[in-house]
Amino acid sequence: MIVHKQLRLSLAYCLCQPLLDLHIGGSPRSTLRTRPATSILSRLKGKHFASGAKKGDKKGICKVCGSERTNRFASTLLALPDQGKVGRALTTDTFANGSTWQYDGLNIRFRDWPFIHRARLNCLPVNNVKSRWSNSCPKCRHCNSDETLPHVLCHCLRNMPSILRRHNTIVDRIVNAVQSGTITTDQQVRAANSRLRPDIIVEEYNKVLIIDVCCPFDNNAEALRDAEQRKLNKYEGVKQFFVGQGKQCEVFGFVIGALGSWHPTNENVLRQLGMSKRYRSLFRKLCCTDAIQGSTNIYREHLGMTEGSVDADNSE
């Protein structure tokens, strides 16, 4: 019985591995090495029985096999230079906020499902991707830049109104979570003689919080860290102005990836706002799915899709 299950796992691996190894514009590995069921069992036997499971414990053995298979697939995906970059950004989130919607569908629409899974693997038919296996022009259909997915979701000038709406949705969610203090949104600090407009300023007594939201593309975890650092550097002058007035001032970059990655240092903002543990859990998930919804809208509008359209593969 166990051998038959292992054979099925090996078959599943053979079927799924080409999808994981496939780079857009390339081809799967010409040869796939599969391990016989007996070799898999021998490799897992020590792990399984070392954990205290008894011989003949089918449920325990299957659990170990499933975990081993999942880890192998995940390692293969994360090792891919292009299709694994979003996955590497998602792994920094210990709460898995960017993926829990797959189980409960929280704040996710039907149209978001086909978009987000292909977007995270860079399999959407934007011109730069299509040009890898065809003679199509890689240029953006609305400007002269290469039409990559990061360009569509974060940089194309034609999409800026939709990009701003995605940004403002997250700003509004943070504002609604503020429990006390005077809130200022998108306003210059005139006394500081600065033209900068922080997304959110919360003042309470002699304490000032400056929160600025951004949604960079999930190009590895470093992209999220760099985006946060740019926010800290940008508002350092405004921070020093409030410090000079004898106030305690903190600057926070609130970073949500365009494809739903949660930056770990966002936890500092949640603590400063005094959120309960239960609401924090919900808030994280809502912010990630807000970003996914906004990116879906941006992509569909970029391709000129109407409300009745279901799939983007046939859009030009």
Predicted regions and their residues:
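Short Cys/His-based metal-binding microdomains
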Residues: 1, 132-173
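Extended C-terminal regions of large enzymes
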Residues: 1-128, 135, 291
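Conserved, non-catalytic sequence blocks in retroelement Pol enzymes and Pol-derived host proteins
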Residues: 106-107, 129-133, 159-166, 220-227
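Short beta-strand-loop-alpha-helix junction that forms the active-site gateway
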Residues: 205-230, 256-258
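Metal-dependent nuclease catalytic cores in nucleic-acid-processing enzymes
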Residues: 231-246
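Domain-level recognition of nuclease-like catalytic cores that cleave nucleotide substrates
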Residues: 249-316
